């Protein structure tokens, strides 16, 4: 019994310089490498306040496996996190602690607002509820729903990763005054508040 002849290795001299460099080296810019490492290594800090948090923690179960996106390391301290996920109803008494937690996070930092209550106050158009968490901290991704499904949280992570991958942030950035960045724009909800409060009759079902 004879063995088949071994395939001779390709001599290095027969490869072009471009082929040899492509097999042995990785060429990129420091900004692209930093963005790639950041988007695949998110350290979330969960701030759950209501029923949306139940759907949020479901993403950590094996059924959805958030670890696939490099965001499974839940941090107990905001000083070790770079992603803040706000889910649930944000009351005015919780706004100051939430802002303090955000300011303790290391830069660069990102924020996901999960659910209708965190996005715009939801159905609680009352004095004690903040009408959107973006009133006092910048938000990168909004997740609609009441409550949103766990798949929506995964979609938000993918959207955030795409956003981080295209960013050209410096290695360190300090978020200061947000005036002029779109966070202080008037909301249609507030513009029509007087009109809603003046209504005394409900619309019939056929007009809804």
From Swiss-Prot:
Q: List the disulfide bonds.
A: none
The cellular component terms of Gene Ontology attached to this UniProt record, alphabetical and capped at eight, are: plasma membrane; respiratory chain complex I
Q: Name one Pfam family in it.
A: Oxidored_q6
Q: Compositional bias of type Basic and acidic residues: which residue ranges?
A: 185-197
Q: Tell me the compartments it is located in.
A: Cell inner membrane
* PROSITE patterns (UniProt xref): COMPLEX1_20K
Q: Which residues take part in binding [4Fe-4S] cluster?
A: 51-52, 117, 146
Task: Report any one BP term from Gene Ontology.
Answer: aerobic respiration
Known cofactor(s): [4Fe-4S] cluster
Any keyword Cell division? no
Q: What is its EC number?
A: 7.1.1.-
Report membrane topology: Peripheral membrane protein
For region Disordered, the annotated ranges are 182-208
User: Principal place where this protein is found?
Assistant: membrane
Reaction catalysed by this enzyme: a quinone + NADH + 5 H(+)(in) = a quinol + NAD(+) + 4 H(+)(out)
* Keyword match Metal-binding: yes
List the molecular function annotations (GO) for this entry.
4 iron, 4 sulfur cluster binding; iron ion binding; NADH dehydrogenase (ubiquinone) activity; NADH:ubiquinone reductase (non-electrogenic) activity; quinone binding
Q: Which UniProt keywords apply?
A: 4Fe-4S, Cell inner membrane, Cell membrane, Iron, Iron-sulfur, Membrane, Metal-binding, NAD, Quinone, Translocase, Transport, Ubiquinone
**What Gene3D superfamilies does the entry give?**
3.40.50.12280
Quaternary state and partners of this protein?
A: NDH-1 is composed of 14 different subunits. Subunits NuoB, C, D, E, F, and G constitute the peripheral sector of the complex.
Family membership, please give it: Belongs to the complex I 20 kDa subunit family.
> Which purpose does this protein serve, as stated in its record?
NDH-1 shuttles electrons from NADH, via FMN and iron-sulfur (Fe-S) centers, to quinones in the respiratory chain. The immediate electron acceptor for the enzyme in this species is believed to be ubiquinone. Couples the redox reaction to proton translocation (for every two electrons transferred, four hydrogen ions are translocated across the cytoplasmic membrane), and thus conserves the redox energy in a proton gradient.
Q: What is this protein called?
A: NADH-quinone oxidoreductase subunit B 1
């Amino acid at each position: 019994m004879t063995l088949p002849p071994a395939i001779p290795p390709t001599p290095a001299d027969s490869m072009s310089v471009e082929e040899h460099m492509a097999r042995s080296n990785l060429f990129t810019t420091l900004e692209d490498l930093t963005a790639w490492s950041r988007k695949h290594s998110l350290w979330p800090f969960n701030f759950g306040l209501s029923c949306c948090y139940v759907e949020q923690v479901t993403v950590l179960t094996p059924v959805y496996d958030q670890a696939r996106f490099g965001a499974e390391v839940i941090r107990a301290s905001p000083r070790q996190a770079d992603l803040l996920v706000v889910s649930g109803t944000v009351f005015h008494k919780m706004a100051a602690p939430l802002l303090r937690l955000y300011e303790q996070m290391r830069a660069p930092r990102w924020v996901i607002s999960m659910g209708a209550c965190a996005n715009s106050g939801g159905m609680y158009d009352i004095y004690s509820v903040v009408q959107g968490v973006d009133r006092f901290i910048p938000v990168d991704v909004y997740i609609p729903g009441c409550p949103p499904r766990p798949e929506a949280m995964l979609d938000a992570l993918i959207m955030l990763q795409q956003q981080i991958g295209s960013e050209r942030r410096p290695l360190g950035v300090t978020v200061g005054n947000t005036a002029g960045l779109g966070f202080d724009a008037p909301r249609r909800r507030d513009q029509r508040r007087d009109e809603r409060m003046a209504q005394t009759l409900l619309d019939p079902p056929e007009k809804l």
